[in-house]
Amino acid sequence: RQEQSQTEKALALINTFATGDTDTARSLLADGYIQHNLAYGTGADAFIGSVEYLASADVKTTVNNIRAFEDGDKVFLQTIYNFAGAGEQVAFDIFRFDENGKIAEHWDNLAALAEPNPSGHTQTDGTMEVTDLDKTEENRELVKNFLYDVMQGNNLDKTPDYFDGDNYIQHNTGIADGVSGLNAALGALAEQGISMVYDDVHMVLAQGNFVLAVSEGTFGSTPTSYYDLWRVENGKIAEHWDVMETIADQSTWQNQNGKF
């Protein structure tokens, strides 16, 4: 049988949370699996332990993958999980594959599933189709520049260059569509003395018209991990999905690999 693609392997791995299939999980993972979700131990054994724990729970875990992308040795996924009935969560997962095709490292960001936002969009609906595979690097570069100029505030006067007028489809749970919607939300936060700061960009992954950025900063005074997925259309930023997560206090970490 044909070797599974990296994306198929990543999807097979997350599905073991629902099936309890430890053999499949074991076959997909590198022994030295590096976990950056700070609530879990690191290594393949810790992952298998989670699968076994979920399999034994009274309420079955559900895994509903929405989008899947591949970039070099990494796969990035947008998925709705409900772990043992604890409540639906929207997640971005990133898996790195080693030279043997095993899953060797994992990063993620999770947030509770919310009601539709002021423009009626959910955290996961919207455009699905991956296109413009010939523009992957161009789109990655555009988002890197956007992060530097706009999200990090280095050249805010360039903001209009990145958008087609006010057209911007927004899936953030608290913000309305349009560049105007984003500005209004940031203005309202500023009035409360809250700023959204992007200090470091750790990863910018891309496939065609979709680009995922992993950034570290603060929301108010809280250390925060930002996962932002942008869809690029004709060289402009057209649509945005995100998950923001507070970075847990180091005293609670179950591994010492760090969030990033």
Q: Where is each model-derived feature located?
A:
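C-terminal and inter-domain tail/linker signature
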Residues: 1-260
